C-alpha cells in the first residue's frame, strides 16, 4: 500500500491531469486515510469507515483519468468498473457482487507478484539449472556443466534455441457461469483450473531462446516456492482493508423520471449496490470477503440526471461530493504542453519514427486550444477529448505523406491550423437541421 502524503499524491496526479485540484485533494486524502487507519489500535481500526466519494463533472474533464492514475499509485487492490455493466439480481447479466470477486483476483495478482519478488534469487538459481539441463542434458559431467554455466553467464548462449517444459496455465478453456443459479457465480468455474488440479498440474513443451526462457522458468520456479494458501489469505485481507472500487458512469443508473421498463432494472442495480457500499459479506472462491472497509469512488457526468436522482440511501453512502469544472482555453493549452504524455509530445514521437521533425509554434498551440473551445461550445462539450479530433484533422495530411517526407522538418503555426480545421470549426453539425 502506498505511503505517499496527500501532497505527493496530488503532485503525481498533476503530471497527467490539468486542474481539478479539489477532486485530486479528495482522492489523495481518501488514499492517505487508508494508511492512517492501518496505524490505529485494532479495536478502533474496525470502527473507522472509509468516506466514499462522488465525483460530478462533464465528460472529458479528467474523472476517469484520475482513476487510472490512482490505480498505479494505490499499491493496493484497485478495480475500475462501469455501473452500466451490471444488472439487478434475477436479470440476465452480471450482478454487482462480481465487482468484489474481480477485486479479490486483482489482490491475488498483487500478492503473488510480491511473493515472487521475495523468492526470485532462489528461483533464478533453479532456472539456471533447468537451462543447463536443456543445453547439455542431465547426464553431462560436472566439468561440462561448469563450462556451459560460464558461457551461459557470459551471455554467449543467449540466442541458442532450447526446449523447456513449463507449467501450462491453460488459457485454452475459458470459464463459464452456471445459469439459473445465483449462488453459483462464487467465481466463474474455470475448466482449465479443475483439469489442472485433477491431473496434478499439467506442463507443456516450449521452444525458445536461452535468454527468453528465463522469464517463464523463473516464474515457474517461483510458483513452486510460494504457498498458494498464504497468498489467498493475504489477498483477502488486503482486499478487505485496502481495496478501492472506482464506479464509473453511475449517473447512467440514476432513475430520471420514475418510468417503468428498463428503469426498474437500473434502480435495482442501485439497490444491489447499497449493501455492498455499506458493508456486507460476499462469497468468493477464496472465501468470504467483507466490504465494510473497501473505499468506493463513484463518478458520473450527470448531464441528463442529477445526483439527487440516485436513491437517497445511496447518496447517504457517498458523503464526499466533488465537482469537476469544465475546461477553458488555458486548460487546453496546458493539456497540450505540460502533461507528461501530452498530445504534442505523442505526435512528435510518432513522426520521429518516420525521421520527420515536427515543431509547434506558440500561436499554433493557441489556435488548437481556440478551435477545441469553439467546437465544445457550439457542437457538444466533450472536454479534453475534443483535442484528439482537432489534432488528427491538423496532422492528417502530414501523417499520410510522412514516409515520402523523411528527413524533413515541419513547423506548424496558427495559419496552418486554421487552414486545416477551418471547415471543422464552421461546419457545426448541420445534419441535426435536416429533416
Swiss-Prot record:
GO terms for biological process: protein unfolding; proteolysis involved in protein catabolic process. Keywords: ATP-binding, Chaperone, Cytoplasm, Nucleotide-binding, Stress response. GO terms for molecular function: ATP binding; ATP hydrolysis activity; peptidase activity; proteasome-activating activity. It is found in: Cytoplasm. ATP binds at residues 18, 60-65, 248, 313, 385. The keyword ATP-binding applies. It comes from the Bacteria. ATPase subunit of a proteasome-like degradation complex; this subunit has chaperone activity. The binding of ATP and its subsequent hydrolysis by HslU are essential for unfolding of protein substrates subsequently hydrolyzed by HslV. HslU recognizes the N-terminal part of its protein substrates and unfolds these before they are guided to HslV for hydrolysis. Belongs to the ClpX chaperone family. HslU subfamily. A double ring-shaped homohexamer of HslV is capped on each side by a ring-shaped HslU homohexamer. The assembly of the HslU/HslV complex is dependent on binding of ATP. NCBIfam families: hslU, PRK05201.1. This is ATP-dependent protease ATPase subunit HslU.
Amino acid at each position: 500500500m502506498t505511503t505517499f502524503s496527500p501532497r505527493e499524491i496530488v503532485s503525481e496526479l498533476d503530471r497527467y491531469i490539468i486542474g481539478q485540484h479539489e477532486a485530486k485533494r479528495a482522492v489523495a486524502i481518501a488514499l492517505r486515510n487508508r494508511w492512517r487507519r492501518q496505524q490505529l489500535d485494532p479495536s478502533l481500526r474496525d470502527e473507522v469507515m472509509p468516506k466514499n466519494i462522488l465525483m460530478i463533472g462533464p465528460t472529458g474533464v479528467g474523472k476517469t483519468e484520475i482513476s487510472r492514475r490512482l490505480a498505479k499509485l494505490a499499491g493496493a487492490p484497485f478495480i475500475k468498473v462501469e455501473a452500466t455493466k451490471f444488472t439487478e439480481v434475477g436479470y440476465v447479466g452480471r450482478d454487482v457482487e462480481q465487482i468484489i470477486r474481480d477485486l479479490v483476483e486483482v489482490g491475488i495478482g498483487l500478492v503473488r507478484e510480491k511473493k515472487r519478488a521475495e523468492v526470485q534469487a532462489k528461483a533464478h538459481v533453479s532456472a539456471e539449472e533447468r537451462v543447463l539441463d536443456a543445453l547439455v542434458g542431465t547426464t553431462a559431467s560436472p566439468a561440462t556443466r561448469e563450462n556451459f554455466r560460464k558461457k551461459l553467464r557470459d551471455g554467449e548462449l543467449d540466442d541458442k534455441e532450447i526446449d523447456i517444459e513449463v507449467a501450462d496455465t491453460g488459457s485454452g478453456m475459458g470459464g463459464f457461469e452456471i445459469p439459473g443459479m445465483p449462488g453459483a457465480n462464487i467465481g466463474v468455474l474455470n475448466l482449465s483450473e479443475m483439469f489442472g488440479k485433477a491431473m496434478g498440474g499439467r506442463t507443456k513443451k516450449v521452444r525458445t531462446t536461452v535468454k527468453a526462457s528465463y522469464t517463464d522458468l523463473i516464474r515457474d520456479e517461483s510458483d513452486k516456492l510460494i504457498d498458494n494458501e498464504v497468498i489467498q489469505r493475504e489477498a483477502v485481507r488486503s482486499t478487505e482493508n485496502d481495496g478501492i472500487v472506482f464506479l464509473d458512469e453511475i449517473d447512467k443508473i440514476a432513475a430520471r423520471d420514475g418510468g417503468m421498463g428498463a428503469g426498474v432494472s437500473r434502480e435495482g442495480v442501485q439497490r444491489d449496490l447499497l449493501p455492498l457500499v455499506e458493508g456486507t459479506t460476499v462469497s468468493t472462491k477464496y472465501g468470504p470477503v467483507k466490504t465494510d472497509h473497501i473505499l468506493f469512488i463513484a463518478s458520473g457526468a450527470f448531464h441528463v440526471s442529477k445526483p439527487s436522482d440516485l436513491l437517497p440511501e445511496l447518496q447517504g453512502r457517498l458523503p464526499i461530493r466533488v465537482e469537476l469544472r469544465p475546461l477553458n482555453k488555458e486548460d487546453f493549452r496546458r493539456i497540450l504542453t505540460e502533461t507528461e504524455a501530452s498530445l504534442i509530445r505523442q505526435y512528435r514521437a510518432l513522426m520521429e519514427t518516420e525521421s520527420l521533425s515536427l515543431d509547434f509554434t506558440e500561436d499554433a498551440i493557441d489556435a488548437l486550444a481556440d478551435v477545441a473551445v469553439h467546437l465544445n461550445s457550439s457542437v457538444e462539450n466533450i472536454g479534453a477529448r475534443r483535442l484528439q479530433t482537432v489534432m488528427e484533422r491538423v496532422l492528417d495530411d502530414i501523417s499520410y505523406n510522412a514516409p515520402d517526407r523523411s528527413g524533413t522538418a515541419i513547423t506548424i503555426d496558427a495559419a496552418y491550423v486554421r487552414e486545416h480545421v477551418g471547415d471543422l470549426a464552421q461546419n457545426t453539425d448541420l445534419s441535426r437541421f435536416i429533416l
